[in-house]
């Protein structure tokens, strides 16, 4: 069964953010990527400290701030592709991921130590209105270009997840979901719906 990874976006969350994180942590998600891209590093550091009080540390992936991860003892990090290329201190992390938008990016990421990649955007998303999705064939091509796990990102919900069944690649590891889980009242129900559709 494919995995579901939650990607956070505090502005989309209408409820108490820490309560939402706790519910996501308690759900059948594999990881939570704490992606708050409008935060300064100090704001982000403070947020992570609070999140660690409600979230399973093994599920938490820090986004974009390696020094914060090291200071707080979080061993998983996800970096935008540009930051991934500049990373010093790969040995500080047990899990390193990056975002790719082409097969060339994917190959570079694998050759330079990424443990997994997110590939997208697969479908049109709420946060990038008007940006056409790259589609299922793009995802299949990315999977074929590398051996590491690949997660689809962009416009994923139970309906679009149905279309991903046809990817049919061993290293297709699952999906990353943002808007849906940030706004959902029934987080685990949504997660399980997506997992059922992915098969």
What are these regions (language model features)?
Residues 45-62, 84, 90-102, 130-157, ...:
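Alpha-helix-loop-beta-strand connector modules within alpha/beta enzyme cores
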Residues 6, 79-89, 118-130, 161, ...:
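Glycine-rich phosphate-binding active-site loops on the catalytic face of alpha/beta enzymes
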Residues 71-72, 76, 81-83, 97-144, ...:
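Glycine/Thr-rich beta-alpha phosphate-binding loop at enzyme active sites
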């Amino acid at each position: 069964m494919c995995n579901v990874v939650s990607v956070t976006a505090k502005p989309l969350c209408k409820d108490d953010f820490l309560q939402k994180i706790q519910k996501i942590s308690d759900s059948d998600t594999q990881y939570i990527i704490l992606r708050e891209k409008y935060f300064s590093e100090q704001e982000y550091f403070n947020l992570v400290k609070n999140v660690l009080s409600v979230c399973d540390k093994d599920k938490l992936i820090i986004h974009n701030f390696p020094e914060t991860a090291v200071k707080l003892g979080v061993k998983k990090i996800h970096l935008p592709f540009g930051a991934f290329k500049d990373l010093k201190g790969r040995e500080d992390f047990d899990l390193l991921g990056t975002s790719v938008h082409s097969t060339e990016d994917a190959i570079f990421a694998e050759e330079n130590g990424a443990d997994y990649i997110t590939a997208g955007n697969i479908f049109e998303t709420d946060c990038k209105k008007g940006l056409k999705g790259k589609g299922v064939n793009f995802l299949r091509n990315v999977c074929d270009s590398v051996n590491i796990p690949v997660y689809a990102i962009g416009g994923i919900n139970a309906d679009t997840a149905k279309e991903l069944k046809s990817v049919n690649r061993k290293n297709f590891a699952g999906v990353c979901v943002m808007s849906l889980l940030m706004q959902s009242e029934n987080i685990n129900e949504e997660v399980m719906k997506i997992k059922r559709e992915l098969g």
